[in-house]
Every structure is written in structure tokens, then in C-alpha cells.
């Protein structure tokens, strides 16, 4: 209690000063206010003096600031504590009055409430502030104020009519032809934001129709409210540049591309080549990037109408190639013909073609007296322009191990070892070797506009890799993969990843088969298998909303995966034609001399995240993660590597990786004298929810409070794992954990220490009366399950 006895701000303030305790907005209106919540959020931005925040929910931040602001408080830790605190939010009537005037002006000038009135009232109260403890009693009486802003908006004016005027008749004719897409129409409420959007729309349409020099500055908005009604006639007046009476339209002229531009270049040193009416100048003997690729990345041509969107697409595409450090597009009117715009495209390549990147990662977790420490070393070698077409080739290798430590039992020992090598080739163009994209477009599965954008901006990815995982004295897995697909990000920022072709060969070796002697379904999931996709392997759609004005943002990740469906259909067709009843597989006698079955399953996973920023130092993050995998054909179980698990530093943090579940089943191995740090509890269905409150503590130290809940279930009843299958009682099998975290925030990454406590068990214990842990049982968990990792869990 030593820190708390004097945490009183009042004794540092003058007698005439008082703290702001709260602010709110109260609407007074006889009629319904359109979009009231949005209007309130807009008005709240004008309130400058808000109540001070608290550190760790009970220590006033203004007290920390004032306590370390004396003349003698000049040491480094005083500066740090002042930065941690906040200047006191002192009530000032002149500030509140200014806020009232700003709100009133905003309602009248921006939102169409021309008769709006704003006032305020102050509610004073004598509050007892300070702290009382067994050691001391330091409580003061101090005046605090609650400020209520009373907003009487009155009736909102509407748009009676919309008209466009200009002396440039050709321009005016074009503008009127596009008015169906206008942001301001008859019957709309008066809104300055919508007016600005309409000006922007008009300017953009004109810039995409040859009017390269047009801008919003040429558009004036006039309104006629001479009548007594609440409707206004709106006129968009389009001025012409003096002394002209019209705006100049441009067509594209000469296009010069400098493929290896440096400032010291002179035209005498350059070699000229031409392709598709584009001049390519180079200083090097050979082209760094194929001119055909550069030509296809330039979306405007000589003699065509000048369009702003084509220049932006060109800039984006050339930058996305990854070969050039700087991309500059300069334009200038032709010296002879004033309606022609010439272009110089300056491309400055990176000096290094090969780059190397390395990383060292680690994590730490606990389970009772057991400790698990994981470390991995990774290195990546990348070529920015492998074949002269800006192809990005990367070779990534990773080596990792997990060390277990159980004091007094086994000491330190290696629990897992893993190694992986992955080759990737990214081609910055759409290479539809199989013709699937064109087929989907021609059959109407995708729209014309989307297909055209996909063809222009999609990248082609080819991958080939190997990984090996060895759970020592348990099982090992060797996996080989090969994929071919496309990666496309739309103008709105939505990402599409489509892999029509993909193969995964998974080879298992079980060291301890006795562990699965009573669990045949688990044993089947460890069968050697080949995952296949000849036309469709998997598809991912990632939606990112961006942050709204209220601090909300959403991230949604959808993944749909299918394996073996082409093999299954072909096998069934063969059986129908031949009258056979065979199930195709790769039998012994192959190069590996192993029986390999075709993996047949359908898998879907949803990961939805919501982030809410309350301020620069406080936010709330939440996640809902759902998944299901269904085997089909003769497969009784889906591959172990594609099943779902919960627990670990990025899931249920009170449990270790794959410790909880499935369902209400409890792994008998956890009852052994030596606690198991490596678990294999997985399922076909996953439900998980997480919520985390994040806040700043001091300098680079952040804090978090979190709750995690979820479990996995099997699709089918398993005699060897009672209560593992999904049922109507699944809610009673939800595991719940809670805890707190400390994060060292280094901007680009953070090191995370999470302390998770089991709050609710997913299974019923015959000894304990409830699945909920008592407060005493939670305290007995000590520091809880300690998880140390890098970056946020979601």
C-alpha cells in the first residue's frame, strides 16, 4: 500500500482549480435526428478537455505527472514518470465556450443544421479523492466538474435540386452525362462532406477523360435558400482557367522509359530500343528487366486519351515489380502541340540483386513444474530479378528445437526437432498455364471487371519445399510440398490467394504406437498420404477494413481447402465403367516402398478479428476462430497435420499447444508422474474466442488483460476417446482461461510475456464438483502458464 497512500492530485492544485470528471453530449430535438450516433461521434472530436485516465485502473495519471513536476524533479526518472502521467485536465470555462462555438459552426456550416444552438451546463460536486489504508488516511475534498454539452440542432435542410454550370460546353456536357453517379442528389440532407466527395468525383472523372490539369479548385458550390422552406437549390459552378474559356484536353504523346536511371546520365551514353511505340533507354549492355514486361506494365499508349487512373496503375505496377528502388513518372506538354502530353518514366534499380535475411526466434511456456523452451534459426536468400522479368526467387531454411526441463525428474532434454526448406518463385504477372482463369471468366463465374483487374495485377507463385518434424520418442513427420497459384490484391485492399495446383506428401513414423492402441481413429490420421489438387487445391480471401473514424477495424481471413476430389471422382467414374470397386492408392513397390493413400478431405477455417482504439494508449482486440475438416470417400479420418488444435502462446494461453480437448476427453497421459509437455490432442472441429484489453504502462512497457475460450472436437464417436465427439453438450466442454500480459514494445516488434490461468476445465473431474476453478485453485497455479513469444497473438 506504500504507493497508494499519497496518490492524491488535489493537494497539487490551486484552490480555484477543479478537475474535469466527465463530459457528455445531450441532444434536445422535437424531431428525429438522422444518424444520431454518427453525429455524436463527430461532435465528440471537438471536446478538447477530457477526464484524465488511470494507470492500472486506479492510479490517477495526473497525480503521477504533478507528483514529479516540482522544481527539484529534474532527474531522468522524473522525466520518465511525467511521460507516463498526464497533465491535469482542469476545467476552464473559456475552453468549453470555444468548444460550444465550434460545435455550433460545424452543425450549421457542415451538416445543414442552419438553426442549430449549442449550450453547456456544469455540474459541480465535492468529491473525496485520495487513498485510505491501514497505514494512513489521506483523503481530501475537492471540487470536480461534469460538463454536459446541450445540442439543439433544429430541423436539417435538404437538397431541393442539383444543377451544373460552366462556360465550357464540352466539359459541361460530359459532367452532366455522369451525374447518375453523383454523391449529391435531390432529397439528400445538406452535408459538406458529401459536397467535397462530389467535387472529387467530378475532378476524377474529368482527369480520366483527358482533362489532366483539372482540380477541385475550379468547382464552386452555390446555394439558393431564398424561399421560406427548408430546401436549397444547389449549383456546382465549374470555372475555366483565365484567360481561356475552356479546359484543355490532352492525349498521350511520346513515352520514354529510362530503364537504369541515375542522376548523372546523359543521352549520349544511352542505347535506344523501341517496343509498342515506347522508347526504352538503357546505359547497360543488356536490359535489366525484359522490355516486354515493362511495356505490359505501362497502361497508357501514344495517341490515346490521357487518363489519370492509367498513370496510377502504371506507377503501382512498376513499383510492385520489386526490382526498382525508385519509380518516377514525369509529364510535360509538348513544345509544338499544346494538346499532347509527353512522359518520361525514370526507373532506378536496386544496387544489390541478391539479399540475405536472418532471424532468431524463441518462446517459453510452463506446465506445472515443467518448462518448455523453443528456439528456431531461420535464414532467407532472395533474388529480386532471377530471370530478367522481375521474378522474385527466395530460398528459406529454418532449423528449430524444443527443450524440456522437469526439475528432479528428467532434467533438460530435447523434446522436438524440426527442419524446413522452402523454395518460392514469384512471377509479377498472371500466368494462366491451365486456362482456369479464362474458363471461369467465360462461364460467368467471375465478372468482367474483376477478371480484367486480376489479369493486370495478379502475381503467379510457384513453391517447392520440404519439412521434417521429430517429436522425440513419439512420432516423426516428413512432408514434401509443391504448389502453383496466384496472389491478387484488389484496389480496395482485399486479398485473394488461389492455388489450383498443389501436392503434399506426408510420411509418418510412429515411435510409440502403444499410446494409440486404444485410439484407432488417431492411428488412422497418422497414415502416409498424398494430398492432391489438379484443378482446385485451396482458396483464401482476406478482408481488411482499415481503421474507421471511430477507431474500429476488422480483419477477416477465410480459407477453403480440398484434397483428393479429382482423384475420387475419376476413381468413381472408372469403377462405374469397369464394374470394379477398387480404391486407388499408391502401393508398395514405389520409390519409397510404402503404402500411400490419397488424402480426401474438405477443410474450412474462419478467422475474424476486431480492433477498437479508445485512445493512443488503450485498445481492445477480439478474435473468433472457427474451423472444420471433413474426410470423405474411404477415408475414416483426416490427416493429422490438417486437424485443429488449441492452446499455446497464440491460442488458449492457459494451456500448452494441443493440450486441451478434444471435447470432454482427458488424455490419460497427463495423469503420469512426469507431466507431458508435448500434446497431440487435435480435432475435426474448432471453436475459439479471445478478447484482450491492451494499454500502455511506461515508456516501451505495455500491459494486457485477456480471456481465452474454446476447444476442439472430433466429428465421429471414438471408443478410445470418450466425450471427444461434438454433441449438443459442446458448450459445457468449453475451456476458459484468463490472465495478464507484459509486452516490451519496440515499434517494429514486441516481446510478449503472458501469464495464463485455467479458469474453467473442458472436462468433468469425478473428484471436483465443478468445472470452474475456485479462487483458491486459481491462486495455487502461481504465475500460471507462462508463455513468452514475439508479437501479438492476434
Protein language model regions, located:
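Periplasmic polypeptide-binding modules associated with outer-membrane biogenesis and secretion
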Residues: 8-364, 375, 397-398, 403, ...
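C-terminal outer-membrane beta-barrel translocator/porin domains of Gram-negative envelope proteins
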Residues: 279, 361-370, 497-695, 705-728
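A generic beta-sheet turn/junction motif
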Residues: 349-351, 562, 615, 744-748
Amino acid at each position: 500500500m506504500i504507493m497508494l497512500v499519497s496518490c492524491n492530485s488535489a493537494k497539487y492544485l490551486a484552490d480555484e482549480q477543479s478537475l474535469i470528471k466527465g463530459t457528455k453530449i445531450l441532444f434536445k430535438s422535437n424531431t428525429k435526428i438522422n444518424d444520431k450516433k454518427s453525429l455524436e461521434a463527430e461532435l465528440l472530436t471537438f471536446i478538447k478537455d477530457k477526464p484524465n485516465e488511470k494507470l492500472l485502473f486506479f492510479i490517477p495519471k495526473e497525480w503521477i505527472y504533478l507528483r514529479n513536476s516540482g522544481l527539484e524533479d529534474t532527474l531522468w526518472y522524473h522525466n520518465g514518470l511525467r511521460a507516463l502521467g498526464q497533465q491535469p485536465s482542469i476545467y476552464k470555462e473559456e475552453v468549453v465556450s470555444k468548444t460550444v462555438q465550434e460545435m455550433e459552426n460545424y452543425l450549421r456550416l457542415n451538416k445543414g443544421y442552419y438553426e442549430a444552438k449549442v449550450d453547456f451546463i456544469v455540474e459541480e460536486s465535492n468529491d473525496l479523492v485520495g487513498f485510505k489504508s491501514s497505514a494512513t488516511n489521506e483523503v481530501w475534498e475537492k471540487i470536480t466538474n461534469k460538463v454536459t454539452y446541450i445540442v439543439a440542432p433544429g430541423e436539417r435542410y435538404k437538397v431541393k435540386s442539383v444543377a451544373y454550370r460552366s462556360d465550357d460546353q464540352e466539359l459541361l456536357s460530359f459532367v452532366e452525362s455522369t451525374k447518375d453517379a453523383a454523391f449529391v442528389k435531390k432529397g439528400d440532407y445538406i452535408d459538406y462532406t458529401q459536397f467535397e466527395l462530389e467535387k472529387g468525383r467530378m475532378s476524377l472523372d474529368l482527369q480520366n477523360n483527358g482533362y489532366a490539369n483539372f482540380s477541385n479548385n475550379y468547382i464552386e458550390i452555390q446555394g439558393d435558400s431564398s424561399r421560406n422552406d427548408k430546401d436549397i437549390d444547389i449549383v456546382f459552378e465549374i470555372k475555366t482557367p483565365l484567360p481561356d474559356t475552356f479546359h484543355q484536353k490532352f492525349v498521350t504523346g511520346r513515352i520514354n522509359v529510362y530503364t537504369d536511371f541515375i542522376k548523372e546520365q546523359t543521352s549520349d551514353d544511352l542505347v535506344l530500343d523501341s517496343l509498342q511505340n515506347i522508347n526504352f533507354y538503357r546505359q547497360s549492355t543488356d536490359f535489366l528487366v525484359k522490355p516486354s514486361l515493362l511495356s505490359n506494365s505501362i497502361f497508357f499508349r501514344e495517341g490515346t486519351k490521357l487518363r489519370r487512373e492509367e498513370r496510377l496503375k502504371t506507377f503501382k505496377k512498376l513499383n510492385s515489380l520489386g526490382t526498382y528502388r525508385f519509380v518516377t513518372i514525369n509529364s510535360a506538354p509538348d513544345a509544338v502541340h499544346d494538346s499532347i502530353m509527353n512522359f518520361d518514366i525514370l526507373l532506378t534499380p536496386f544496387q544489390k540483386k541478391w539479399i540475405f535475411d536472418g532471424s532468431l526466434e524463441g518462446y517459453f511456456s510452463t506446465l506445472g513444474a515443467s518448462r518448455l523452451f523453443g528456439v528456431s534459426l531461420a535464414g532467407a536468400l532472395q533474388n529480386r530479378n532471377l530471370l530478367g522479368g522481375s521474378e522474385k526467387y527466395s530460398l528459406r531454411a529454418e532449423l528449430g528445437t524444443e527443450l524440456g526441463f522437469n526439475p528432479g525428474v528428467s532434467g533438460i532434454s530435447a523434446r522436438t526437432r524440426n527442419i524446413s526448406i522452402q523454395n518460392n518463385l514469384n512471377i509479377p504477372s498472371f500466368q494462366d498455364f491451365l486456362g482456369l482463369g479464362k474458363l471461369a471468366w467465360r462461364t460467368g463465374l467471375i465478372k468482367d471487371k474483376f477478371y480484367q483487374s486480376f489479369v493486370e495485377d495478379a502475381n503467379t507463385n510457384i513453391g517447392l519445399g520440404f519439412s521434417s518434424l521429430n517429436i522425440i520418442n513419439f512420432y516423426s513427420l516428413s512432408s514434401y510440398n509443391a504448389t502453383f497459384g496466384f496472389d491478387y490484391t484488389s484496389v480496395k485492399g482485399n486479398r485473394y490467394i488461389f492455388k489450383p495446383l498443389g501436392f503434399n506428401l506426408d510420411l509418418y513414423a510412429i515411435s510409440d504406437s502403444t499410446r494409440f492402441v486404444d485410439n484407432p481413429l488417431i492411428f488412422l490420421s497418422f497414415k502416409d498420404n498424398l494430398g492432391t489438387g489438379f484443378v482446385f487445391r485451396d482458396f483464401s480471401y482476406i478482408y481488411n477494413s482499415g481503421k474507421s473514424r471511430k477507431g474500429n477495424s476488422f480483419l477477416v481471413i477465410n480459407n477453403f481447402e480440398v484434397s483428393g476430389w479429382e482423384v475420387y471422382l475419376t476413381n468413381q467414374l472408372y469403377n462405374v465403367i469397369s464394374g470394379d470397386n477398387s480404391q486407388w492408392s499408391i502401393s508398395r513397390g514405389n520409390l519409397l516402398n510404402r503404402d500411400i493413400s490419397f488424402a480426401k478431405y474438405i477443410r474450412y477455417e474462419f478467422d475474424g478479428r476486431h480492433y477498437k482504439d479508445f485512445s493512443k494508449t488503450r485498445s481492445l482486440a477480439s478474435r473468433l476462430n472457427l474451423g472444420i475438416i471433413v474426410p470423405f470417400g474411404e477415408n475414416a479420418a483426416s490427416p493429422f497435420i490438417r486437424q485443429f488444435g488449441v492452446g499455446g502462446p497464440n491460442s488458449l494461453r492457459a494451456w500448452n499447444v494441443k493440450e486441451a480437448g478434444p471435447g470432454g476427453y482427458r488424455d490419460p497421459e497427463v495423469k503420469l508422474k512426469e507431466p507431458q509437455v508435448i500434446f497431440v490432442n487435435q480435432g475435426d472441429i474448432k471453436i475459439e474466442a479471445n478478447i484482450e484489453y491492451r494499454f500502455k504502462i511506461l515508456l516501451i512497457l505495455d500491459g494486457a488483460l485477456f480471456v481465452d475460450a474454446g476447444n476442439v472436437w472430433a466429428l465421429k464417436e471414438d471408443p478410445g476417446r470418450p466425450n471427444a465427439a461434438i454433441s449438443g453438450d459442446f458448450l459445457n466442454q468449453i475451456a476458459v482461461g484468463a490472465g495478464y500480459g507484459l509486452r516490451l514494445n519496440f515499434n517494429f516488434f514486441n516481446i510478449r510475456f503472458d501469464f495464463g490461468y485455467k479458469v474453467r476445465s473442458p472436462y468433468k473431474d469425478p473428484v471436483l464438483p465443478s468445472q470452474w476453478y475456485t479462487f483458491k485453485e486459481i491462486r495455487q497455479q502461481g504465475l500460471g502458464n507462462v508463455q513468452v513469444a514475439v508479437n501479438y497473438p492476434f
